[in-house]
Amino acid sequence: MQRSPRSPAGPDVAASAPGRDRAGLVESRGIDCVPDSERHGTARELFSVWAAPNVSYLSFVVGGTLVLMGLSLAESLAVIVAGNLFWLLTGFIAVSGPAAGTSGSVISRAMYGVVGNKAVVALTGWLISSLYLALNWSAASVAGLGLTARLGLPDSPALDAVVVCVIAGATILVAIYGHATIVRLYTALTIVLTLVFVALSVMVLGHTNWSYTPAEPLTGLAHLVVLTSGFTIVASAPLSYSNSPDLSRYLPRHTRGRAITLWTACGAFLPSVVFTGIGALAATTLDMNDPQAALESVMPHWFVPVFVVAVVVNTVANNGLTAYSSGLSMQSIGVRLPRMIAVLVVGVIGTTMTLFALLVFDFLTAVNAMMELVVIVTGPCMTVYATDIVLRRNRYDGELLHDQSRTSPFWYRGGVNWAGVLAALGGAAGATLCAGSTFWAGPVSAAMDGLNLAIPVGVLGSAALYRVLSRAFGTFPSTSSPTTTQR
């Protein structure tokens, strides 16, 4: 296939770099296409890739938060299951990775255009990812500092910085080594982390009040407000992972889409539901306003350092994926750096934000606020992506997606696919109007006493808009057009 002529933007920097994807070696490939000769693995390996990050301390925190908000135990568990169903969407967009053989931040040029995609990826693939890096590193650092206090080390800003930098350094190292190392390492981490968190769960179950009811049961509209807010908090996790194509792109092109979807979704769904549920059970008797202290109160002393190390290891696993994809996102928006250097830059930014967060913000408040508000952006963007996959029947030409010239089939009008951009903006605007949180209540939400409909409005609205606007702008994806490749 002939490539289009170069423009000042030109093809991506690394578009013809040789690949190397072996565990224990630094991955040399960036966003460039993975040729069929270098494809390997099975969809089953995606289970541990997504399980390790979700055997998580934050799951306990979120589960406890639902009960603290005033939900009953049964309602909390129902919200946990419902919100985590969005992992199916994360799994679904992963099918585009093997189809195109490149990262999701490049594939999304089909939705937003060569130029428009830069702005979208800068926001969702870089800025929001950096915020999540800081959030997770903050959680692990709080746990790590608790361990240093038990060891008798005096608390100080210098010690805070050392703990953060050690955790961040381990995370960035995983991201630098890249895909094959992540796949191999996360299989072992899934087993180890599951053993530790299952042991903790058994301890929590021994203190659970199975007949728990809130002291002041919620009724009427106030009840719906808390239910929708809790649902938003839980669903924000799967809706933030638009990077799933990055981890599936090395799979053979013929890998079944259903297998990719289910192994990805199940890997994240199962531990998320189980351990978020355990967090809710813990809150029936423990004071989860201070989740670390609450959980440590049911542990034998010897288990506390094991728990803290597991929290740190899980954070490394979680943020390892985020940092890995953030490096690819930087390349896709035109930052001409090797993948390894791009990951280092992301790590420095995330570390700086973490230190600021530890010194300035209350951790639990920051978790709730971010998880309630981030879906305003991530929900519509992920839905536009999923809708494009449906409309194109998952047929993407990775080589054409790397062409950034004005003759690129993804140049659209002035480099922007206005159907995708307006659909994402429209969905985000609708979600903003209907969002309700501690820090922000949109006019629609405020008129309904804080009812949070950001997710259904943002998700359904952006999907409908993208389909309608694609026809209106004449960019409706055609499976027989030269912009696609038959599989």
Language-model features, listed with the residues they occupy:
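Transmembrane helix-loop boundary segments of multi-pass membrane transporters
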Residues: V67-A78, L147-A161, A180-L189, P291-V308, ...
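C-terminal membrane-solvent junction of multi-pass transporters and transport-like membrane proteins
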Residues: C381-L465, T479-T483
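Membrane-interface "cap" regions at the ends of multi-pass membrane proteins
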Residues: Q2-L73, L224-F231, R249-G257, F473-R487
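Hydrophobic transmembrane alpha-helices that form the core helical bundles
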Residues: N117-L153, T315-S332
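Membrane-water interface regions at transmembrane-helix termini and the short interhelical loops
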Residues: L68, V95, M111, A119, ...
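Hydrophobic, membrane-embedded alpha-helices of multi-pass small-molecule transporters
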Residues: A43-F60, S201-T208, E216-A282, H301-G320, ...
